[in-house]
Amino acid sequence: MSTNSIKLLASDVHRGLAELVSKRLGLRLTPSELKRESTGEVQFSIGESVRDEDIFIICQIGSGEVNDRVFELMIMINACKTASARRITVILPNFPYARQDRKDKSRAPITAKLMADMLTTAGCDHVITMDLHASQIQGFFDVPVDNLYAEPSVVRYIKETIDYSEAIIISSDAGGAKRAAGLADRLDLNFELIHKERARANEVSRMVLVVDVTDKICVIVDDMADTCGTLAKAAEVLLDNNAKDVIAIVTHGILSGNAIKNINNSKLKKVVCTNTVPFEDKLKLCLKLDTIDISAVIAESIRRLHNGESISYLFKNAPCK
């Protein structure tokens, strides 16, 4: 059992997930203040001593504000480091720039590696994330990384809300096949893949379905929903092939650009996202949106890490609500 206490910190901008986690742990959020000067520079201060404490910084980053939130996070980490915190763990459920994990064209940067370098340079000792877009990002770090999975929480949601005896798990591309197949195995369901051809980024020109989905509840699973164009087209293809209903379940609801319009105008019955990304404002604009709360997973990972217990239990099991 660790003798130093847990201190939870969160940005002033998105505190929803941090507040849920703090309630589950029976802890208050450590007082802090983040101010933006007229010059655009950020000042951050911690309202009490964090010397020799176990710090957990919970950072939710919304769509369209990535760069500001990332730099604010670096300042928060460095403030804890210079205040002599014993250990600083950053909880980034949706890791920024995760899709830029390799050189996919000449002279392109590997920005996910830059993110890892920035976090460690700022003073981060440990990172907790969820459903990394590319698992090899863990290898970019010189500090420990725990990549949690939303799958156990998704399994619970499906069992509680869907007549899954009539369901089939769908992956909208080859990249998500492993994730969808794993979920299908957990539920003892069939898994199928939709082949998609892209004309350009975020734009799907053609989708091909090679299985019979007649009278099936099709559950499309993916790690993130951005503009939701792919999900909308997938739903159309599935329903044109006599599917009963189409539900999308994604870990990271980025919901950028015309996402809400695309969902509202689509044939999707429901789009379910975890709260790794803040999208409370969008819930009011789209009745098809639903949320899976992963605060229990984050809270339990904090408790286990602080007490020196294994986190691998959470890879296959969802904590009690």
Curated annotation (Swiss-Prot):
GO-annotated cellular components: cytoplasm; ribose phosphate diphosphokinase complex
Pfam families: Pribosyl_synth, Pribosyltran_N
UniProt KW keywords: ATP-binding, Kinase, Magnesium, Metal-binding, Nucleotide biosynthesis, Nucleotide-binding, Transferase
Entry-linked PANTHER family: RIBOSE-PHOSPHATE DIPHOSPHOKINASE FAMILY MEMBER (PTHR10210), RIBOSE-PHOSPHATE PYROPHOSPHOKINASE 3 (PTHR10210:SF48)
Enzyme class: transferase
Reaction(s) catalysed (UniProt annotation): D-ribose 5-phosphate + ATP = 5-phospho-alpha-D-ribose 1-diphosphate + AMP + H(+)
Similarity comment: family membership: Belongs to the ribose-phosphate pyrophosphokinase family.
Binding site residues for Mg(2+): D131, H133, D142, D146
Disulfide bonds: none
SUPFAM superfamilies linked: PRTase-like
Example of a GO biological process term: regulation of cell size
Name this protein carries in UniProt: Ribose-phosphate pyrophosphokinase 1
EC identifiers of the protein: 2.7.6.1
Matching NCBIfam families: PRK01259.1, ribP_PPkin
Molecular-function annotations in GO: ATP binding; kinase activity; magnesium ion binding; ribose phosphate diphosphokinase activity
Organism: Candida albicans (Yeast)
Transmembrane segments: none
